[in-house]
């Protein structure tokens, strides 16, 4: 969700400002209008209601916003383009989004799609100071990216980290972001559903996604979804809308996933995944051949898969292609697609042992593999 610059809103504000000025001019030119004439009966004066105290819920929401808004940043993404006639390079806005301060070392977390294709990224803090940012690491499969700015620790307020495992449908949530370029906009809602799946830019499935009805619009991408205590529970990433504007269904990558990925991106610049060291036949081909499971295309030399004797596809002496082993389960959990296999791997870390169940011809076999780091 990329937002456009808020020029329309500015021009509307000016229009309404001008209209208000003109509507006041008659009163300025005719000061007697509305003033009681001498000797006439006094006109009733409207009574202004006394201010009422805010409810405890309102006070709590205000306190959360005041505390968390300092962690939320505005991200502008620009790219360089060459004029086809003059061959001069010039900057073109790619859009804008939201992010939040992760650490006092200047790490900023946002969505990968917010900074995709950027040649230059500008981060604006809550105090309006601007910094050029560099990309430290990105994981397109989970739509997460980490930036870094050179700002003093005193100016950075990291967001408070919560957890997403204990979330309940119906609990209150708050979203802070920059929809349509309108910075630090607060919206509230509830957790509408848990355990949703969405597709990332790389067409990978993101599991365990939070669904919310807190308004999320273009420009909110990469912003924090908070619980009622102001703790981060997700990163706003997508909406379902036929018009492109909010229609009551928004999605956030759960914080437990983010909290696993971000330290890896800061340390390595990419997500180090556990795996078997194999390449796989696309799901579409497996379905076409009527295969249920994931077909191994090639086994890497010295890989975890080779060490347990898994076979890839091979050409027979007669020139016929023989399918590789078909992975059908990991630790007893069925595997029917590449996404299923990768999701199973992501539940573990490098060095963990997993039980691989696979089919070879008419035989069903099992082996225990020690997971290795893979790209």
Segments (PLM) and residue ranges:
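Conserved PDZ fold ligand-binding element
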Residues: 108-109, 307-338
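Bacterial N-terminal signal peptides
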Residues: 17-31
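Short, solvent-exposed beta-edge and connector elements
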Residues: 87-89, 295, 308-314
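Serine-dependent protease modules
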Residues: 36-289, 298-301, 319, 338-342, ...
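N-terminal secretory signal peptides that target proteins for export/translocation
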Residues: 1-12
């Amino acid at each position: 969700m990329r937002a456009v610059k808020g020029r329309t809103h500015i021009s509307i504000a000016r229009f309404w400002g001008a209209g208000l000025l003109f509507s006041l001019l008659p009163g300025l030119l005719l000061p007697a209008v509305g003033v009681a004439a001498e000797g006439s009966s006094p006109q009733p004066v409207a009574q202004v209601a006394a201010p009422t105290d805010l409810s405890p819920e309102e006070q709590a929401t205000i306190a959360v916003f005041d505390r968390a808004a300092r962690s939320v940043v505005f991200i502008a993404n620009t790219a360089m383009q060459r004029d086809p006639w003059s061959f001069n390079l010039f900057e073109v806005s790619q859009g804008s989004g939201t992010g939040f301060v992760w650490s006092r070392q200047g790490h900023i977390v946002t969505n990968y799609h917010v900074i995709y294709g950027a040649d230059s990224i500008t981060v604006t803090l809550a105090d309006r100071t601007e910094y050029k940012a560099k990309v430290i690491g990105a994981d397109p499969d989970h739509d997460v990216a980490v930036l870094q700015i050179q700002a003093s620790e005193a100016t950075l307020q990291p967001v408070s980290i919560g957890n997403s495992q204990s979330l309940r449908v119906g609990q209150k949530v708050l979203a802070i972001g920059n929809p349509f370029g309108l910075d630090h906009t607060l919206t509230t809602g509830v957790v509408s559903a848990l355990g949703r799946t969405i597709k990332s830019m790389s067409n990978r499935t993101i599991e365990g996604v939070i669904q919310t009805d807190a308004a999320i619009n273009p420009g909110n991408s990469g912003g924090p979804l908070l619980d009622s205590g102001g703790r981060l529970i997700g990163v706003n990433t997508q909406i379902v809308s036929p018009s492109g504007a909010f229609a009551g269904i928004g999605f956030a990558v759960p914080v437990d996933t983010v909290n696993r990925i971000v330290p890896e991106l800061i340390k390595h610049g990419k997500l180090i995944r556990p795996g078997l060291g194999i390449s796989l036949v696309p799901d579409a081909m497996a379905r076409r051949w009527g295969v249920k499971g994931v077909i191994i295309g090639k086994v890497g030399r010295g890989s975890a898969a080779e060490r347990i004797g898994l076979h890839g596809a091979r050409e027979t002496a007669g020139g016929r292609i023989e399918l590789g082993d078909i992975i059908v389960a990991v630790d007893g959990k069925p595997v029917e697609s590449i996404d299923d296999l990768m999701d199973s791997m992501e539940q573990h870390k490098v060095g963990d042992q997993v039980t691989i169940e696979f089919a070879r011809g008419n035989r069903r076999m099992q082996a225990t593999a020690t997971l290795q780091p893979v790209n």
